[in-house]
UniProtKB/Swiss-Prot annotation:
Keywords: Hydrolase, Protein phosphatase. This is Tyrosine-protein phosphatase 22. It catalyses: O-phospho-L-tyrosyl-[protein] + H2O = L-tyrosyl-[protein] + phosphate. Belongs to the protein-tyrosine phosphatase family. The gene is STY-22. It comes from Styela plicata. It comes from the Eukaryota. Substrate binds at residue 83.
């Protein structure tokens, strides 16, 4: 989260689920919906989670404790990628990509995106 604040990243894209076939694939690095969690010098509040067909969009309010920086960050998580395979169709992935591009444009688009 410190990197997100330092680089002023507004969009995070995640293409994996935390668990697949009962195995841990990724560390969950965000708080549950409507909850706040502090990571070092950065406080993260999960404002909302919206489920779309094939992906989730989370909106976070980020606050840097020592630099008094606040910002809004969006995370898009594709949840239909099968373990050790490829999706049957790309329509949901393409739809998520369009949402990501739109979000980048709406948030200024000058900061790097985290994938």
């Amino acid at each position: 989260w410190l990197m997100i604040v330092e680089q002023k990243c507004r969009v995070i894209v995640m293409l994996a689920k935390c668990f697949e076939a009962g195995k841990k694939k990724c560390q969950k690095y965000w708080p549950d919906s409507k909850e706040t969690k502090t990571f070092g010098r950065v406080k993260v509040f999960n404002v909302e989670e919206v489920k779309y067909c094939g992906f989730l969009r989370r909106r976070f309010h980020i606050e840097s404790v020592d630099e008094v920086i606040t910002m809004e960050v969006f995370q898009y998580q594709y949840i239909n990628w099968p373990d050790h395979s490829v999706p049957n169709t790309t329509s949901n992935l393409v739809r998520m990509h369009k949402y990501v591009i739109q979000c980048l444009e709406e948030t200024g688009g000058d900061a790097p995106m985290v994938v």
